[in-house]
Amino acid sequence: MAKALPLISCDSWADSINEEDVEPKFKYHRLANDLKYMLNADVITCSAVHLKFLIFGTFRGRVCIFDHQGNSVYSNLSASERHTHQVAVNNIDVDHKGEYVATCSDDGKVNITGLFSSDNNHSLSFGKFIKVVSLEPDSKAHIKRFVVGDDKLILYERNLLKKLKPVELCSVEGSVLSICWHGNFIAWASHIGVRVYDLNERCSLGLIKWEVPPQERLENFRCHLRWSNKHTLLIGWVDTIRVCVIRKRNSIEASTGNLPVYIVDPISTFQTTFYVCGLAPLSAKQLVVLGFRKEKSSCFKALRPVLCVIEYKMNNSEEICTDSLTLRGFEEYTVNDYSLGGIIEENRFYIVAPKDIVVASLIETDDRIEWLIKHSKFEEAMELISANGGNVPVLSVAKLYINHLLALKKYDDAAKLCLRMLGNDKVLWEEEVFKFVKCQQLRSVSAYLPTSDECKLDPHVYEMVLYEFLKFDVCGFLNLIKEWPSHLYDGLAVINAIHDNFRKHYANQLLESLALLYSYQGDFESALRMYLKLQNKDVFQLIRRYELYDVISKLIIPLIQLDRDCAFEILLDKKKIKTEIVVHQLEHNQEYLYWYLDSLLKKDPSNVFQKKLISLYAIFDRNKLLPFLKRSKDYDIQEALVICKQENFYPEIVYLLGCMGGVEASEALNIIIHRIRDIEMAIEFCKEHDDSDLWNALINEFSKHPEIVTKVLDGIVDYFSPAVVVGKIKMGQNIPNLRQSLIKMLRHYNLQGEILSSAQQIQLNDYFEIHSEIVTTQRRGQQVSYEQLCSLCHRPVLMAGTHLYCIIRLECGHVYHKPCIQGELLKNCNECNLWKLTVGK
């Protein structure tokens, strides 16, 4: 079983050289089990990774096979006690099916070994160092071909006699350093660069020259070749990576000479900050690269190797993440001691060192979730679970996130998260709410608590929230009372809590809260009293909503004090509250009674309480008293007179005395003359009553005052004989403007005579004109047709032998036979009873 190691740790074998909060791409574990025994006794010099197993070549020349967990696997390789090679194994290759293994060594041998069959085993001895060998990868091939590289590139295949036949493919500049075979293309590296050989065309597609590193030899660095697909070749050599595409030449390129069908096109070339120890494809534009750092430690030792994910573009690249790996003995290794194998289908990569093997697996969803949680990236973890699923429930992450936010005192964010994640789960809500209780931050979650019938929490939860608001935020407490349905909590318990924690500084908010709570409980009288203490006009809305007209009978004065207009809007409606009740309540507040009765008079002019307005108008608004006395008849004149006399309201007294008539009218005139002293008013008073005694009294009084005689003369025209006034003037008495006044009076009488004469003449003219028109109309003939019937006998009016004088036609248009009416004169038409008889013929 593979031993699991910490993902990334400075003290362990893998550290991230990025910032700690950057999400890793890989998780790592070290291979152990049977493999560790081999590593204790020997050193790995080369390796091959297959989908089924792992094969390692050692310094002592052995070839060992293990499963992916490091357990030894029995095969033909392990059946033999002898070493496969005499010295260190240089290269291992496995066919696609995992049936044959090819190895080579400095002992000059190349061995082709069937793991489970010996039918096609071969052992070739070249008598010189053999660095690379490669099996044909084609899984459909029954007869395996292989390529050996020394100072030439040689293909071995069977002839007709089933014997191996060597075919020299290419001569080599120096020696073959690396081979990678895929389909019909063989990529191989020499001392000057990389070539691709086309087996179908039996030709090289060209040389990709490689830059020689300064103060180094190119052959001192292992060239790493890998096909990411059948037309894309990855090359990593020294500190340069090149991505090449094998494509067919276009028509223009193919026309320029005898050239191969295919061409090698480098599509991306970039340098790294380290030496390349191996590479593999990760995605369309990403590579996994094992690197050896160029720098040395302070002790001039090698630094830890790095595993990078690089995203490449045309001629540049970007390191997505870089992990520094602590492998056993790394300080003593060189760049060629490391290799990178991979199972691309499973995104699993093997970092192979002489004394250690570490597996890097692309981090899975659950691993990512674990890392995100560990680094407090809860939001990203929940998004990942929502998108890709996983073994960790999203609610578990949400709970951890809530705890984290509460620890950071981000209470509002935690509350919003509750709303988003807890849904309508009552149990979850109650569980999470108690976390806010411990922080005394129920106020933060209050706006998000479920209040619907689908998810109603325990009343105790809502009460705890209200108590916290009552303690720390009275305004917020009031808002909750307004917003929350009253059935969520025990209203009486909250009312008691307010009384126990009443603070005068927040009296307004607490009184309004009590008013609302009392109304929720149906105790409307208490609610009204709270509103009135508060002087809150919402009391009127409450009265209308719940029709509390019986309740307000004892609260009329406070309601008027709060808002007179709103109060009267209710009090003036007899259907809601009786007038008698209102008047009784206002008896001891004369001003409010005046306001009420004055408003009531406008709405109900015949109300029985209007007589009280006389004394009220006398006190609060005298200007309304006289119009009221003139307009209303439902009061006692004597009582009104007493009130007016007490206040010396002379115009009102004059009006009342005038209404009484007789002696009282003379008293009224006397008041006008001696108290009010208004001649025009006196004249108008006499005109109104048209009493000769009043006129005589007026004339006698004012004849003593020459300066106002002319005013009397002007005023009495058409009402009293001016001769009486003139007769009262004494001989030799000087009357200002008398002449003008007399002329004016005479002209007035003259004008009246002319108007009367003209009116008579006009009337006579109209009479004669209308009379003439009537006579003319009555003499005019009337049409009678043959279709008309007698309205009595219903026979045609005009028949043979009928005399015209025997027909009678009425104004309404109906006609009769004269014999039918038996000689009687019709006063009305029998048909329509509308017109009198007008014409008889």
Curated annotation (Swiss-Prot):
Ranges for the CHCR repeats: 570-711
> This protein's superkingdom?
Eukaryota
What is this entry's stated membrane topology? Peripheral membrane protein
> Where is it found, in Gene Ontology cellular component terms?
clathrin-coated vesicle; early endosome membrane; Golgi apparatus; HOPS complex; late endosome; late endosome membrane; lysosomal membrane
Q: What family does this chain come from, according to its entry? A: Belongs to the VPS41 family.
Describe, as the record does, how this protein assembles with itself and its partners. Answer: Part of the homotypic fusion and vacuole protein sorting (HOPS) complex, composed of Vps16A, car/Vps33A, dor/Vps18, Vps39, Vps11 and lt/Vps41.
**Per its database record, what is this protein's job?**
Part of the homotypic fusion and vacuole protein sorting (HOPS) tethering complex involved in endo-lysosomal vesicle trafficking and lysosome biogenesis. The HOPS complex facilitates docking and fusion of lysosomes with late endosomes and several other types of vesicles. The HOPS complex is also involved in autophagy and crinophagy (the elimination of unused secretory granules through their fusion with lysosomes).
Specify the protein name. Answer: Vacuolar protein sorting-associated protein 41 homolog
List the lineage, top down.
Answer: Eukaryota, Metazoa, Ecdysozoa, Arthropoda, Hexapoda
Give the gene name.
lt
